[in-house]
Amino acid sequence: MTSPPEPAPAPDGGATEPTEPAAEAAPAPTAADPAPAAGPTPGRHDPIPAGVRAIAGTLRKAGHEAYLVGGCVRDLLRGVKPADWDLATDARPEQLLALFPGALYENRFGTVAIQVGDETYQVTTYRHDGAYSDHRRPDAVVFGDRLDDDLARRDFTVNAMALAIGEEVGVDLDAEPAVDSARALDRADVADPAAIHDPFGGRADLAAGILRAVGDPAIRFREDSLRMLRAVRFAATLGFAVEPRTLAAIEVDASLARSLSGERVLAELLTLLAAPVPSVGLRLAQETGLLAAIAPELARQQGVPQGKVPGEDLWDHTCRTVDAAPRPAPDEPPLLRLAALLHDVGKPATFADGHFVGHDAVGASLTEAWLTQLHAPRFLTADTTNLVRHHMFAYDASWTDAAVRRFIRRCGASAIQDLLDLRAADNVGSGLSPDVDGLESLRSRCREQLDARVALDLSGLAINGDDVMKALEIPAGPALGQLLDRLLEMVVVDPMLNDRSRLLTLARDLAAADGATTGPAGPSSNAGTEPT
């Protein structure tokens, strides 16, 4: 059971999480007032936004320090465009508010939101933290004057570097990301190596592709147990190896992850699933015990015989299937990979005599319960559950067009392509070709029916509930819904029936056959069930 909701962490800053998110700030008068920090020489590409340099210039002009910190420094050195730009300074929040009229400070962690143009940047005062009695957030935050103290509280060495913003940095962010960290560092072309403040050896670890906790890993993970999930996530997203002492500390304290809120677990899981090869992180989570802490139903897959790829169990199949599922587009949730992760979650509970009877229905129930526990968005819970529920369809080339339309109606027109992609990934995860049992033929036939714009749900009928209520003089209620469902089934079988007058005639006939009379009583409730 996860604990109550709490603010989700920033993705890659590396600081103690969670921080209370700063509110959107009103625009600060930065166009003329700030003294911009030093920029790149002519002809060099400057990856640092002008707004960041403007903020840094104002801070430096006022006698304060200004550094980029956390994940943005790591990504700059990798030759990757940072998603977020986080600054750290010795200026106190009240000093920041005085320097930047319109800035907002609505948390206790020293983070001030400063808006420059259309962008809002987070600027945080140097700090060191007190004890972490709940393994999630510091009991007290003390503002400091030393950058090293601020970096010492961060999670991993690659996230514990700082860049003096006034220095020149040239990075080609239009080029393809380097395959390995060493090449990325070469291409980053930091003009002055001294501009990178690196007290914990993060740059060397970045070059070697190593994920290492700052200081004692046991202390870091007991401060904030989310850092263990971040470790396996970074292993997948960055392709890094977790340093042995860091990995061992995760194995010792993996059970602490049970206390994490659902939102924090979900945020890390979704980011991991969007990685190039998610199984890297998933397998680490299983091996260290993290998976058992956050998703015991998935952890139970290990050791369950699968009988598909020799020598592999059900968990191996799940990992293969996740890797085979299409990677999501930027800013899109990894729906398909989440469904791939959960598609066989019902198998351990249904395993008997070498079979998994009804595992799709059981899996759908477990999926809905787990994603609800994680406080996933309703659409993501519903869409993932639907894919898990319907992933065991059995197509045959003898299906009529009406059978194809009925299949689309049952699964949902908007879900069909995802469902077929999930089946293709499931096939690959089983050591087979994606197009087993005529999957591409079914995809083509589904596309034909969708392109024909035939009615596949109630919104496609030529009449609606109001039309039926007026024509038959019946009230709204379950019987009306059943009647509309029966009309839709008839149209699915014969699209030519989708005509207003025909449907109203059919509605009267169906109501009469059920013994219904017009008036308040309406059609009887024994309107039948949808044909299979």
What residue spans do the PLM features occupy?
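Catalytic cores of the polymerase beta-like nucleotidyltransferase superfamily
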Residues: 1-532
